[in-house]
Amino acid sequence: MATLRSFVLVDNGGTGDVTVVPVSNANGVAEWLSNNSRSQAYRVTASYRASGADKRKYTIKLEVPKIVTQVVNGVELPVSAWKAYASIDLTIPIFAATDDVTVISKSLAGLFKVGNPIADAISSQSGFYA
């Protein structure tokens, strides 16, 4: 069983990294937040459910805020202008070995690796072209 612990969500090489810390584990849903106020925080939730007798289902959700500065009475305050949302449902057969699941985890990381088509489309706010 995975332990709830802090982890680096956005790795910027040590400068401006975003670390999220566990804040809740209620009703089977684990939640992590960055150190900002809730409205300005990066947020990750993850849950695990049995899906039939032979499958495990993981649901991972991510919120990424766009932080801007707003001036109120001459004081600059950080506020969230908007948030981007992601949701991933992952269903794994119960008989998958540790090596199989490691490959699945690496595949998920590879989907969004800089330079891959999915990451490029997201970065350029475009679709997919031949």
Swiss-Prot record:
Species this chain originates from: Enterobacteria phage JP34
Organism lineage string: Viruses, Riboviria, Orthornavirae, Lenarviricota, Leviviricetes
Domain of life: Viruses
Keywords on record: Capsid protein, RNA-binding, T=3 icosahedral capsid protein, Translation regulation, Virion
UniProt-listed SUPFAM superfamilies: RNA bacteriophage capsid protein (SSF55405)
Family per similarity comment: Belongs to the Leviviricetes capsid protein family.
Full protein name: Capsid protein
Gene3D superfamilies hit by this protein: MS2 Viral Coat Protein
Biological-process GO terms, alphabetical: regulation of translation
GO MF entries: RNA binding; structural molecule activity
Pfam family, one: Levi_coat
Subunit structure: Homodimer. The capsid proteins form dimers that assemble by group of 5. Twelve such pentamers are linked together with free dimers. The homodimers binds to the viral RNA via an operator hairpin, but also to many other RNA sequences in the viral genome; this interaction probably shifts the virus from the replicative to the assembly phase and ensures specific encapsidation of the viral genome.
